[in-house]
Amino acid sequence: MKLSFKFKPSISKKQLEIVEELSYHTTKLYNIINYDLRENGVKTYYDIEKEYKSNWHCDFLHSHTRQQMFKVLEQNWKSYFASVKDFGINPTKYKAKPRPPKFKNTDKNKNEIIFTNLAIRYDNGLLKLSLSKAIKSLFNVESLNFEVSKKLQSIIDWNSLQQARFNYDKVQKCWYLIVIYKKEELENNKTNVGSIDLGLDNIATLTFKDVLNQ
């Protein structure tokens, strides 16, 4: 199964500049394509990729980051059309008729930056996120690196990461990092039975049928 973990990384001035630069280009590109879809009709991910992969903003985005943004935008439009269809059947579920996906804002509504597992490396306590050649040259770095504390290392398996997402908190005005990772799903012991008794003196009492195996 896949799980997610959200935390606020310790970001240096240079790292923040890189994140903001990536956010600027993915936000601008999102808006350009979204405007096109609003004016000229919806397109598939493959059509978007074919038409916009040569846009100059893409030079500053790793190919996997760019492609994930395209897929998110495509999904946003699919969700919109599904909502419009459902609105026609169940209008009372909605306060108003669904509207097309909104535009992003480089200051207040920054677009999410997504790195897939192909753009993520973890090496001896260091999380490395792949960057485009243009960003590497602009900031004189090989990758966007973050030290993972011992505490965080103990919480999840960093070698099983599937995605890393930078998400901007509009209220706190800071960046959070969301990592999505794989974890083996344990089989439930279907032969055992447990019950919870909410009490007055004790918060709760847990009772198991097969106590010796707990």
Language-model segments: what does each one mean?
Residues 1-214:
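Nucleic-acid substrate recognition interfaces
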